[in-house]
C-alpha cells in the first residue's frame, strides 16, 4: 500500500530537520519588557514560505484592552525603534489590498502569554 505524502507531512519534516532561511528575534521594549520570541522562515517545495513563531510574555485577556489574539505582520523595514516611524508599511510587493498583503500573516492565539 502506497502512503500519500501530504503538505502537512512535508512541513513537519521541514520544522523537525530543516534549517531556517531567515530568523527574526522578538524583544520587548520599556513598556513591555517581558516580551520575547523568535520567528523562523523556511522555504517549501510549494513556492511558499513556512513561518514558525514562538512568543512569550504576551498580555493575556485579563489585561485591560487585551485579548488572546494578536495580529502579526512583516514591515518593509527592520528598524523597530520607538515610535516605529521607520518600519515602513506592511510588506506588500504586489500592491494587494489589505488584508491580503504578502506581509499580513495569520493571527497568533495566545494562552497564558504564550503563542
Regions picked out by a protein language model, each given a short descriptive name:
Residues 1-115:
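N-terminal leader/targeting pre-sequences
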